[in-house]
Swiss-Prot record:
This is Protein WVD2-like 6. It is found in: Cytoplasm, Cytoskeleton. GO terms for molecular function: microtubule binding. Residues 1-179, 254-403 are annotated as: Disordered.
Length: 403
């Protein structure tokens, strides 16, 4: 016969000692005089016991403890080599449990009544070695259910602690933001700023409109006042004539002055040529002195220039129309004119060309005067003119350098 083990759900334990079965339990009623027969460790109804276990949920820890106890009981049975028969257990009024063979088990405690067991809703579990495989299968079914329930409980507790619930009491999702009952101060301040700026803009627009209206009124009043003044005036003002206005100054045109530079002297010339050129330059640059009259003498203050006649001096302006005196004739006949040493041929030719023209002019001017004069004077003047012509060839113009 196979070994069996008995486990009580309400805390009662079955002990095997010396081939006898004893049962320990707490009695709810101390005065219970009825005896009952418990079928424990029976091999006749293993399926009924297994069906009763399916309706109950047992924690993992209790199942593990029960399995350990079963292993110990089996080991003791195999070592003893005895088979345990089914035993009827009776309960006396004294509260002691007596076996069918008449021996009393030591340390026996009163057993609970079936009423208390039915009230508590717990039953004894009987497991058999042959049906051991069916129990772990049922335990594996119960384990995922327990894990799922535990996970749900833990998730709900974490959600309650981490995220607040809505007003309705429904938990929020993890991704959704919490809806707080208050609003941020930033939003309130932003609204106040908008209101303040809108009021400022309205004030600014109102001020601008007032300014525009005031300016328009001021212009209208000024125009009306000017019209009244014009009407009150007895005369009309005419525009100012143009000649009262100051004329604009004429613009002075700047004339460009021609820059003339003197020619540089040629150093490669001969000495003779350089002397002749210097003499020509002296004659050209120095002014010419007029002829002196015969009766005048050269002053002592003015020195005589080289190449000049000693008797010649500056000639004061004399009227050409006046006749010459006989004393002048004698001076001209007695005086000798010395030719100039440093006079060139060019100066002589120029003087010869100019002097005959002057003499012709003198004759033309003196002719009307001579007509009125005596015939004797006219005869005397004729030889004078001839003498003057002859002397003009011999007279050389004196060149003097002004200091």
């Amino acid at each position: 016969m196979d070994s069996e083990s008995v486990v009580a759900a309400d805390g009662a334990d079955c002990a095997i000692a010396n081939g006898e079965v004893t049962m320990e339990g707490d009695s709810s009623n101390g005065n219970g005089g009825t005896s009952e027969n418990l079928e424990c460790c029976s091999t006749q109804h293993p399926m009924e016991a297994s069906e009763g276990t399916q309706n109950e949920q047992v924690d993992d820890s209790k199942q593990m403890r029960g399995q350990k106890v079963q292993g110990r009981v089996k080991h003791e049975k195999t070592s003893g080599g005895k088979n345990i028969p089914s035993v009827l257990v009776k309960k006396k009024k004294d509260g002691k449990v007596v076996a069918s063979n008449g021996s009393v088990a030591p340390n026996v405690k009163p057993v609970k009544s079936p009423k208390s067991k039915s009230l508590n809703g717990r039953e004894a579990h009987v497991t058999k070695h042959g049906n051991h495989d069916s129990l772990p299968a049922e335990g594996t079914r119960d384990k995922p259910k327990l894990r799922e329930t535990r996970k749900q409980v833990n998730d709900t507790s974490e959600d309650d602690t981490q995220y607040p619930k809505e007003d309705d009491g429904k938990p929020r999702r993890a991704s959704a933001l919490p809806n707080y009952g208050f609003s941020f101060r930033c939003d309130q301040r932003a609204e106040k700023r908008r209101e303040f700026y809108s009021k400022l803009e309205e004030k600014i627009h109102a001020k601008e409109e007032e300014k525009n209206t005031v300016q328009a009124k001021s212009k209208e009043t000024q125009e009306a006042e000017l019209k009244m003044l014009r009407k009150s005036l007895n005369f009309k003002a005419t525009p100012m004539p143009t000649f009262y206005q100051e004329p604009q100054l004429p613009k002075t045109e700047l004339k460009k002055i021609a820059i003339t530079r003197p020619k540089s002297p040629k150093l490669g010339r001969k000495k003779t040529n350089s002397r002749a050129d210097s003499e020509e330059a002296i004659t050209i640059q120095t002014p010419r002195f007029g002829r002196l009259s015969l009766d005048e003498k050269t002053p002592k203050d003015n020195p005589v220039v080289e190449g000049s006649v000693p008797g010649e001096t500056k000639k004061p302006p004399v009227r050409k129309s006046l006749p010459r005196l006989p004393s002048e004739k004698t001076n001209l006949s007695n005086g000798k004119v010395a030719p100039a040493k440093a006079v060139t041929a060019s100066t002589k030719a120029k003087s010869e060309r100019k002097k005959p023209d002057k003499d012709v002019d003198d004759l033309s001017q003196s002719s009307p005067v001579d007509d009125n004069a005596d015939p004797e004077d006219s005869q005397e003047q004729a030889p004078r003119v001839n003498e003057d012509r002859n002397e003009s060839h011999m007279v050389v113009e004196v060149v003097a350098v002004e200091p």
